[in-house]
UniProtKB/Swiss-Prot annotation:
Keywords: Antibiotic resistance, Cell inner membrane, Cell membrane, Glycosyltransferase, Lipid A biosynthesis, Lipid biosynthesis, Lipid metabolism, Lipopolysaccharide biosynthesis, Membrane, Transferase, Transmembrane, Transmembrane helix. The gene is arnC. The keyword Transferase applies. This is Undecaprenyl-phosphate 4-deoxy-4-formamido-L-arabinose transferase. It comes from Yersinia enterocolitica serotype O:8 / biotype 1B (strain NCTC 13174 / 8081). Belongs to the glycosyltransferase 2 family. The keyword Lipid metabolism applies. One of its GO terms (cellular component) is plasma membrane. It comes from the Bacteria.
Length: 327
């Protein structure tokens, strides 16, 4: 193993949103797992504008004597991936591990991720074994993974699992990307030379419900489409051409049928004509909506507003170390 592959410090980044029930156990289990490491470590918990007592619990944990915890408090809810990027800005380790706060992926897998990363991988992903989710979410996740693999060329089986390890140069490359719509696993793989995956346990959620509502899942789907590729825009031209050709063919067919069967038949085909017309109009609106989604995201990027606003960072000693590293 080369010197450049050795890991000197590990940073754990965990986004938190209304997880007050799971936080005590999360902190306890994550700290216990990190104590098994041979490297120094820090645990950065990012409160993504929680409306419960999550921020207070994180602040108290960060203020404990000899605490390895840094609490990053955002002023409002920005979303999971923006919260993780806020945590990335605070890390001082050369291996960064992301983890969800719901404990569906066990923190006890952290030492194994570190061990695999030491083999020289830039990104270590995970695949959830015996996934404890609904059939709808499993099916949607499988379709998304297939789409991502085709677009990126990176054959990874579970892009939706956020228990992942990244080398520091990968995180720094992601921080230099300023687009607001970000899906971190995909973005990381665009910079990674060597990637791998390991299988991890997946448990049922013990506390609360998933924070991804239907609308958030739809927004995530749009993020995936627009951050992956511009192929849908090219497909619009292809679909438009097919619709135009179909419309022309149908028009010729209707004229021929009218000449053969007479005007009485044409009167009977009005409703068919309207049905086809509505289909074409619907396809146009779908295309306009997709085009508008791209334009809207370009508009957000051009405004160059920050992805998030950090209200407070708690954990004085760790924060000072981070500032020294950044200098």
């Amino acid at each position: 193993m080369s010197e450049s592959e050795k890991i000197k410090k590990v940073s754990i980044v965990i986004p938190v949103y209304n997880e007050q029930e799971s936080l005590p156990i999360l902190i306890e289990r994550t700290s216990a797992a990190c104590k098994l490491l041979t490297q120094p470590y820090e645990i950065i918990l990012v409160d993504d504008g929680s409306s419960d007592n999550s921020a207070e619990l994180l602040t108290a944990a960060a203020n404990e004597p000899e605490s390895h915890i840094i609490a990053v408090l955002l002023n409002r809810n920005y979303g999971q991936h923006s919260a993780i990027m806020a945590g990335f800005n605070q890390v001082s380790g050369d291996l960064i591990i992301t983890l969800d706060a719901d404990l569906q992926n066990p923190p006890e897998e952290i030492p194994r991720l570190v061990s695999v990363a030491e083999e020289g991988y830039d990104v270590v992903g995970t695949v959830r074994a015996h996934r404890q989710d609904s059939l709808f979410r499993k099916t949607a996740s499988r379709m998304i993974n297939m789409m991502i693999q085709r677009a990126t060329g990176k054959s990874m089986g579970d892009y939706g699992c956020m228990l992942r390890a990244y080398r520091r140069h990968i995180v720094e490359a992601m921080l230099h990307c300023h687009e607001r719509s970000t899906f971190i696993p995909i973005l990381a793989n665009t910079f990674a030379r060597r990637t791998t995956e390991i299988t991890v346990h997946h448990a049922e959620r013990e506390f609360g419900d998933s924070k991804y509502s239907l609308m958030k899942l739809i927004n995530l789907m749009y993020d995936l489409i627009t951050c992956l590729t511009t192929t849908p825009l090219r497909l619009l031209s292809l679909v438009g051409s097919v619709i135009a050709l179909s419309g022309f063919t149908l028009a010729v067919l209707l004229v021929v049928l009218r000449l053969v069967f007479g005007p009485e038949w044409a009167g009977g085909g009005v409703f068919t004509l309207f049905a086809v017309l509505f289909m074409f109009i619907g396809a146009q609106f779908v295309g306009m909506g997709l085009l508008g989604e791209y334009i809207g995201r370009i508009y957000n990027d051009v405004r160059a507003r920050p992805r998030y606003f950090i209200q407070k960072v708690v954990g004085a000693e760790q924060t000072e170390n981070n500032q020294e590293v950044e200098k």
